[in-house]
Amino acid sequence: MADEDQYRGDDQIDEEEEEIDESGYKTVKDAVLFAIEVSDSMLTPRPSSDSKKPAEESPTTAALKCAYHLMQQRIISNPRDMIGVLLYGTQASKFYDEDENSRGDLSYPHCYLFTDLDVPSAQEVKNLRALAQDGDESEDVLKASGERVSMANVLFCANQIFTSKAPNFLSRRLFIVTDNDDPHGDNKSLRSAATVRAKDLYDLGVTIELFPISRPDHEFDTARFYDDIIYKASPSDPDAPAYLQTDSKASPATGDGISLLSTLLSSINSRSVPRRAQFSNIPLELGPNFKISVSGYLLFKRQAPARNSFIWLGGEQPQIVKGVTTQIADDTARTIEKWEIKKAYKFGGDQVAFTPEEMKSLRNFGDPVIRIIGFKPLSALPFWANIKHPSFIYPSEEDFVGSTRVFSALHQTLLRDKKAALVWFIARKNASPVLGAMVAGEEKLDESGVQKFPPGMWIIPLPFADDVRQNPETTLHVAPEPLIDQMRYIVQQLQLPKASYDPFKYPNPSLQWHYRILQALALDEDLPEKPEDKTLPRYRQIDKRTGDYVLSWADELEKQYAKISAHGPKSTLVERSAKDRTSEVEDAAPKPYKKVKVETDEQGVEDVVRAPYQKGSLSKLTVPVLKNFLKAHGRSAAGKKKELVERVEEYLEQK
């Protein structure tokens, strides 16, 4: 959500609602500049290893497609974010709108600013798509220079772009895509100049992200040059990007262009949006007068279609509307000033007004804090207790020096002892306090060694008694063992790869359709005919894997049903033969019981029950009659007489 606070007045911001507005954590604007190297090796198509995808693709083209896809995503989800594309190593030179013979060629040789750092327009998106997909269009621009490119010039060019186009952005990123791990060789002066320019970018607040690509005959080694110019973001900075480590492995060089694109895109997407702080530098109290400082992040949140801003479509180009709210009296249409507005509650028919200070005090439960109350084993934390989004916390050194060391010791202790801390948690001012479980989380890496989840602590809000509802009454029916055994083979064949669900492979179809429509409107494209739904089952593959097992299970189901039907109890509402009634009496003879007269047909039971219901005397009926009525209408007949009467009344009220 981009700059949502501009639609809210100061009084709305001060008098925050009790529920935390999680959408507000996405409001920081982001500026991303792609720096893509254009060299002979980067322009060489990589051989395809898949016979189904014979088309070859060069790393430069794959990187341009990454920039295009990211631009597509951000123009819809974050319309105020800026994205630019800088090509370096090109034969031509261009800086802003200057031609090859102007100052740009002299200042930044072999640097071609293809897309200026700005909010992408529809035409810029189309131009980038043409460069990435049209061979004729790319021939004029993607020509490698025979001379070496100074990385100091590239970094200084990026510095000028960020300074002039995004001077006040809190999040500024430079994405470098290259396969050259040592651009300057033994030239110490060029290496030193590049290091100085990288330090200038870091001091400016620009984060450099490297996306290395290995060559077929050479593995990319960041230690040769790039380790000296890339600075790790400080964890104490709440506006820093998510703490994802630099890729330990470079993008593969042996795969085809599509797999290379997928690898780059997934790597870029994982670092494309900074995870904003949910709360910053609040105290974590481990005991009396023993505090450290932590910041919290919201790493998981369900995405849903939402309005980022209002768009005016009446002009030649769509424009983002700046909202202004004015309060007007209903009867006189007079503009109401802020000091004239009062809030009141109804008590006994009268409105009792409260001052703003009194309203604030009503919602004030204390200063923001995370206070440890005690510790419990992880086994005492049930799975169903996780009812809200957990908060990821990480230490901060701003308020208390040494917080990282204490936090690390607590994290390791909770992991080793398999315990969770019970905490009193107030996330921010005016927020409702909650009891939460603070659980230590381990670091998780993917197959290529890239960090998926950082080590830290998770605060899981625990439900109060009012949040836990009673499960509806159901009757448990356990299937026979042969059916369970047959189904076990089916389930084993339908398991996902590595028995884990990857949400990135199954995007929300309704959300993607919503974005696709917005994208078509923004880029002046034809509206798509039908949505792409990757959540639909692959019926052919399912039939291929489990078809025989399903048929075998169906045969077993018929056999088990026949057995159950043959040995099942006889209903008292079905007319039976004299032989069945005689055998039932003989079976029951050793166990005498009080015989109760019941009706033998459904209509009879209906008449017997409905008449007392209309008179309000259902409780005078006997338990067997009530049970027979409930069984005849497919309702549960378990429980005491009071419960049976309530079920009968509920059924008859619906009729």
Swiss-Prot record:
Residues 1-26, 568-589 are annotated as: Disordered. Residues 618-652 form the SAP domain. Residues 1-11 have a biased composition (Basic and acidic residues). GO terms for molecular function: ATP binding; ATP hydrolysis activity; damaged DNA binding; DNA helicase activity; double-stranded DNA binding; telomeric DNA binding. SUPFAM superfamilies: SAP domain, SPOC domain-like, vWA-like. The keyword Protease does not apply. Keywords: ATP-binding, Chromosome, DNA damage, DNA recombination, DNA repair, DNA-binding, Helicase, Hydrolase, Nucleotide-binding, Nucleus, Telomere. Transmembrane segments: none annotated. InterPro entries: Ku70, Ku70/Ku80_beta-barrel_dom, Ku70_bridge/pillars_dom_sf, KU70_core_dom, Ku_C, Ku_N, SAP_dom, SAP_dom_sf. Residues 12-22 have a biased composition (Acidic residues). Residues 284-493 form the Ku domain. Its EC number is 3.6.4.12. It catalyses: ATP + H2O = ADP + phosphate + H(+). GO terms for cellular component: chromosome, telomeric region; Ku70:Ku80 complex. Gene3D superfamilies: 1.10.1600.10, 2.40.290.10, Ku70, bridge and pillars, SAP domain, von Willebrand factor, type A domain. GO terms for biological process: DNA recombination; double-strand break repair via nonhomologous end joining; telomere maintenance. Single-stranded DNA-dependent ATP-dependent helicase. Involved in non-homologous end joining (NHEJ) DNA double strand break repair. DNA-binding is sequence-independent but has a high affinity to nicks in double-stranded DNA and to the ends of duplex DNA. Binds to naturally occurring chromosomal ends, and therefore provides chromosomal end protection. Required also for telomere recombination to repair telomeric ends in the absence of telomerase. ku70, of the ku70/ku80 heterodimer, binds to the stem loop of tlc1, the RNA component of telomerase. Involved in telomere maintenance. Belongs to the ku70 family. Heterodimer of Ku70 and Ku80. This is ATP-dependent DNA helicase II subunit 1. It comes from Aspergillus sojae. The gene is ku70.
